Design a protein with these regions (language model features):
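Conserved helicase ATPase core of P-loop NTP-dependent helicases/translocases
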Residues: 148-183
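Inter-lobe coupling linker of SF2 helicases/translocases
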Residues: 1-89, 101, 105
Length: 203
């Protein structure tokens, strides 16, 4: 019915040049802390005993949302154990470490072309003066891989349209090489893909 009342064309129909997506999935084994937490999370899902997760017992209202709570913990745990609690330490095989190594690999591979990279994560977004996954990966890129700090930026740093435009222009000019952001802030309306070589999705 829709085709009877509309005239539509696909990108292929009108010859729009679009890059071919080359999707790569990385299988990262859990760290020892993650393995232990997964077992606790499974027991919590069965029993509702929140003390297994290092938190207070569930309220009556929370009891009804037990599986939502478990899902939220699972998302945080899979990204970084420090999203669950500050008692956990960094680990060389966590997702932040693997992501930093991967970003550095493409940074060096496309250095002559000033290739740029987007890093998407809706969890652990940038918060000044507070531990977050964005800043942790940036720290690893600078300290472990020697990438200049000024070439790594967060879309959340832009507080107005001019600052946002400056970030986008910096990416297109190759002055900024890595840009972090959430889906809502970096997913649409950001025409910074002129030199883009890789898009990383963490969650």
């Amino acid at each position: 019915f829709y085709s009877e009342i509309t005239d539509y064309r696909t990108a292929k129909d009108i010859g729009i040049d679009r890059p071919t997506k080359n999707e790569i999935l990385y299988n990262i084994p859990p760290t020892p802390d993650q393995e232990a937490f997964i077992q606790s999370l499974m027991q919590f899902a069965k029993t509702g005993d929140a003390t297994l997760l290092g938190r207070e017992p569930l309220s009556q209202r929370e009891e009804k949302a037990k599986m939502l709570i478990a899902t939220d913990y699972a998302r945080k745990m899979s990204l970084d154990m420090r999203m669950v609690s500050g008692i956990y330490d960094d680990h060389p095989d966590n997702k932040a470490s693997h992501c930093a190594a991967n970003i550095a690999k493409y940074y060096n591979r496309f250095n002559a072309q000033k290739g740029t990279q987007f890093v998407f994560s809706d969890l652990g977004t940038y918060k000044p003066n507070e531990w977050n996954v964005y800043s942790e990966i940036k720290r690893k890129l600078v300290e472990d891989h020697g990438i200049p700090a000024h070439e790594i930026r967060f879309i959340q740093e832009a507080k107005n349209d001019k600052q946002r435009k400056d970030l986008i222009n910096g990416m297109n000019e190759g002055k900024i090489r890595v840009l972090f952001g959430s889906t809502s802030m970096l997913g649409t309306g950001v025409n910074a893909q002129k030199r883009a070589v890789v898009v990383h999705h963490l969650d």
